[in-house]
Amino acid sequence: MYKKIGIIYHPLNPAACDLAIKLTAKLDSLGIENWSDSAWQADKLTSKMQNTQLIFTTGGDGTILRTAHAILPLEIPILSVNLGKVGFMTELSPEDAISGLEKVLAGDGWIDERSLLEAEYLPHDSAQSRQFFVMNDAVVARGQVARVICVSVDINSQPFTTYKADGAIVSTATGSTGYSYAAGGPVLQPNSADIILTPILPHLGRGYSLVLPSDSTVDLQVNTWHEATLSIDGFINMQVSSGDTLRLRRSSKKVKFMRLRPNNYFYKELDTKLKGNNESVYDR
């Protein structure tokens, strides 16, 4: 029995806000403790997560990414409503939100576990390192000036290559349908723990993606006279300097999704979603 449920919504999507209100009213009518807040206030949600057993999201994949970061290192299941455009990670249509909630409360559903990466940012000047969880991808890329950068790659502490390119992407299986795919990377089955390494527009060569075993460690070192950036899951962004390193490895933590569809849903919907990948502004 669920005793406490959270609702996290996209604050700039009116439909997402309205649905959050309806879900709150439904939970109130059932006498279930609940709370709701904006996905853009994720850093302020820690205290609300205490004893929360399920998180309902109303938005798109971007809302889910922010929610996952807010939940971690806890592993509270996420039940998501697609009010974005593509919704690779979402579970329910807006029309099915209330009935989907009722089914889960009645004991239906199964847990879909997704692997994460842990990223450690190591500045070249020995300043304090920073740690991040990565659900989709970590991207080291050029800045606003249209100049290629060099990204040296080590795999398991052994030199692999240096990309002279717009950057490089390290992706999870969950993120394989995102930026990595757009850069020519493969699509992995979402429960895979493998890691994808993909260059972005490499100079003097087509480049190729590499699928690495789940126990791999990948180091990306920036070498450039120009501006460079680091982006984690598309919303944690910072400038980086020449000599800085990003170290990535698989995390022991998981992100858990509550599913109501059959467990072959990914293959049934993959082709349709990839062909119709026209993102809504509200999916960011």
Swiss-Prot record:
GO terms for biological process: NAD metabolic process; NADP biosynthetic process. NAD(+) binds at D61, G62, R66, N136, D137, R147, K164, D166, L201. Involved in the regulation of the intracellular balance of NAD and NADP, and is a key enzyme in the biosynthesis of NADP. Catalyzes specifically the phosphorylation on 2'-hydroxyl of the adenosine moiety of NAD to yield NADP. It is found in: Cytoplasm. The active site is at D61. Its cofactor is a divalent metal cation. It catalyses: NAD(+) + ATP = ADP + NADP(+) + H(+). It is an enzyme of class 2 (transferase). One of its GO terms (molecular function) is NAD+ kinase activity. Coiled coil: none annotated. Keywords: ATP-binding, Cytoplasm, Kinase, NAD, NADP, Nucleotide-binding, Transferase. GO terms for cellular component: cytoplasm. It comes from Dehalococcoides mccartyi (strain CBDB1). Belongs to the NAD kinase family. SUPFAM superfamilies: NAD kinase/diacylglycerol kinase-like. Its EC number is 2.7.1.23. HAMAP family: NAD_kinase. Gene3D superfamilies: Probable inorganic polyphosphate/atp-NAD kinase, domain 1 (3.40.50.10330), Probable inorganic polyphosphate/atp-NAD kinase, domain 2 (2.60.200.30). This is NAD kinase.
